[in-house]
Amino acid sequence: MAGSTKDIDALIELMARLPGLGPRSARRAVLHLIRKRALLLTPLADLMGQVAATARECLNCGNVGTSDICDICTDERRATGELCVVEDVADLWAMERSGVFKGRYHVLGGTLSALDGVGPDELRIPRLADRVTAEAISEVILALNATIDGQTTAHYIADQLGGRVRLTSLAQGVPIGGELDYLDDGTISAAMRARKEL
């Protein structure tokens, strides 16, 4: 081989640690970046340096941005009485893409998990209780994943906040375009329990 590829190999190895990329996909991505150095690699490296220097968690809700308090928390047009609780930032961003929620968010940073040793103090649950009181929240919407840990977390939060605020959760069941034959028993069961009048 004409020259050392140590740095390129290290980049491939690092890229392979990203979600959704294995060693083969990482190698293809790195080779593509190198081929498109001026168009992709150089601007990407510059932006990654900027993000590494400025990215931080919002001190209020846990969103990711470039200031101590994120744009959502400082947006005065947002409904201040509604707080949507999500597991992580990716869930917050998914809710924002839908455009249906106009309130504020609270990112837990995960779910309770006895197997993984994650308790309430490892998450932002105590901060959630503080926000409900300090911000005069009237409704907490639990938008947690329909997993065992997600449901355990939802029940724990309901126990902690019960009686202090209206608690709701996202409906669960048959997705738009979904066919019953392809759904698991738990999804069909949840859909039956959440049925509504037409």
Curated annotation (Swiss-Prot):
Gene Ontology MF term list: DNA binding; zinc ion binding
Gene3D superfamilies per the UniProt record, alphabetical: 3.40.1360.10, 6.10.250.240, RecR Domain 1
Keyword vocabulary terms for this entry: DNA damage, DNA recombination, DNA repair, Metal-binding, Zinc, Zinc-finger
GO annotation, biological process: DNA recombination; DNA repair
InterPro entries xref list: DNA_Rcmb_RecR, Rcmb_RecR, Rcmb_RecR_Znf, TOPRIM_dom, TOPRIM_RecR
Start and end residues of each Toprim domain: 81-175
PROSITE patterns assigned: TOPRIM
Zinc finger (C4-type): 58-73
Ranges annotated as spanning the membrane: none
PANTHER family for this protein: RECOMBINATION PROTEIN RECR
Record's function text: May play a role in DNA repair. It seems to be involved in an RecBC-independent recombinational process of DNA repair. It may act with RecF and RecO.
Family stated for the protein in its record: Belongs to the RecR family.
Name of the protein described by the UniProt record: Recombination protein RecR
